[in-house]
Amino acid sequence: MELLGGPRVGNTESQLCVADGDDLPTYCSANSEDLNITTITTLSPTSMSHPQQVRDDQWVEPSDQLQGTAVFDATGDKATMPSWDELVRQHADRVYRLAYRLSGNQHDAEDLTQETFIRVFRSVQNYQPGTFEGWLHRITTNLFLDMVRRRARIRMEALPEDYDRVPADEPNPEQIYHDARLGPDLQAALASLPPEFRAAVVLCDIEGLSYEEIGATLGVKLGTVRSRIHRGRQALRDYLAAHPEHGECAVHVNPVR
């Protein structure tokens, strides 16, 4: 059992723990004959161009020296501005993992990942050196919250009062395969949370961000971050208590060491 996120100063709450077998597949490696998933690298917008392109035969193994987006983040030198290929190669896995944990399904996670990189590439020239991964967290999370609000608004405006709900279709084989690998118990517990609470818990207990970083990502005060995490964790406990078959599987709530 691995404690995700690690201890934090002044954080006496419990943290979400995930069983070691609940690893998410990486975004780019998800492209297989079984799933037939198109990777983001094939979706590079043709309308976007960048003078610095990276070919496959130019790729070298990482070294101890700063390279890629790390150089740009550290120096702010426009000459080291990353290309689309560099952004995707270095950050797609992490962005996809966050998008999946937030959205709870493969289709939305892929859409959020694609939209995140489009947004990043369009804005990278105006990026101020700081924490590049934190910037990615903020964009991904805000896009997710925007998606949730947009869908809620569409449902409220478009559905008539006498709308008959249609039962959901049975999960297709691709979704069954995907869920079996990704710990459906964990995702079901997270999906039970309101979007704002889910984002705070995912960023804290899965992505390992500090309360201050979460506040910057979500654009809320520190007290609001603490409240959302506390209430989100309590909601997880309530969910697990109501679904004991999940309590001994992939999701546990243990004290911070």
UniProtKB/Swiss-Prot annotation:
Q: Which GO terms describe its molecular function?
A: DNA binding; sigma factor activity
Which Pfam families does this entry report, sorted A to Z?
Sigma70_r2, Sigma70_r4_2
Gene deleted: what happens?
Increased susceptibility to detergent and heat shock, slighty decreased resistance to oxidative stress. Poor growth in both human and mouse macrophage-derived cell lines. Attenuated infection in both SCID and BALB/c mice. 13-fold decreased transcription of sigB, no change in its own transcript in culture. The sigE mutant induced the up-regulation of human and mouse macrophage gene expression, which correlated with an increased innate immune response.
Q: Which residues bind DNA?
A: 211-230
Q: Which UniProt keywords apply?
A: DNA-binding, Sigma factor, Transcription, Transcription regulation
Top-level division of the source organism's lineage: Bacteria
Induction and repression of expression: Unlike many sigma factors not directly autoregulated. Expressed from 3 promoters. P1 is 55 nucleotides upstream of the major start codon, used during normal growth, repressed by surface stress, P2 is at the start codon, under control of MprAB and is induced following surface stress and alkaline pH leading to a leader-less RNA, while P3 is 63 nucleotides downstream of the major start codon, transcribed from a SigH-responsive promoter under conditions of oxidative stress and heat shock.
Enumerate the Gene Ontology biological process terms.
biological process involved in interaction with host; DNA-templated transcription initiation; regulation of DNA-templated transcription; response to heat; response to xenobiotic stimulus
Q: Where is this region: Sigma-70 factor domain-2?
A: 87-153
Signal sequence residues: none
List the residue ranges of the region (Sigma-70 factor domain-4): 186-236
Against InterPro entries, the record matches this protein to: RNA_pol_sigma-70-like, RNA_pol_sigma-70_dom, RNA_pol_sigma70_r2, RNA_pol_sigma70_r4_t2, RNA_pol_sigma_r2, RNA_pol_sigma_r3/r4-like, WH-like_DNA-bd_sf
Q: Where is this motif: Polymerase core binding?
A: 111-114
Its function, per the record, reads:
Sigma factors are initiation factors that promote the attachment of RNA polymerase to specific initiation sites and are then released. Extracytoplasmic function (ECF) sigma factors are held in an inactive form by an anti-sigma factor until released. Responds to heat shock and surface stress (detergent exposure). When combined with isolated core RNA polymerase from M.smegmatis is able to guide initiation from the sigB promoter. Required for full expression of sigB, and for sigB induction after detergent exposure but not after heat shock.
According to the UniProt entry, the note on domains is: The sigma-70 factor domain-2 mediates sequence-specific interaction with the -10 element in promoter DNA, and plays an important role in melting the double-stranded DNA and the formation of the transcription bubble. The sigma-70 factor domain-2 mediates interaction with the RNA polymerase subunits RpoB and RpoC. The sigma-70 factor domain-4 contains a helix-turn-helix (H-T-H) motif that mediates interaction with the -35 element in promoter DNA. The domain also mediates interaction with the RNA polymerase subunit RpoA. Interactions between sigma-70 factor domain-4 and anti-sigma factors prevents interaction of sigma factors with the RNA polymerase catalytic core.
Quaternary data: Interacts transiently with the RNA polymerase catalytic core formed by RpoA, RpoB, RpoC and RpoZ (2 alpha, 1 beta, 1 beta' and 1 omega subunit) to form the RNA polymerase holoenzyme that can initiate transcription. Interacts (via sigma-70 factor domain 4) with cognate anti-sigma-E factor RseA under reducing conditions, which stops the sigma factor from functioning. Inhibition is specific; RsaH and RsaL (anti-sigma-H and -L factors) do not inhibit SigE.
Similarity comment: family membership:
Belongs to the sigma-70 factor family. ECF subfamily.
Q: Name the chain's protein.
A: ECF RNA polymerase sigma factor SigE
Q: What is the lineage of its organism?
A: Bacteria, Bacillati, Actinomycetota, Actinomycetes, Mycobacteriales
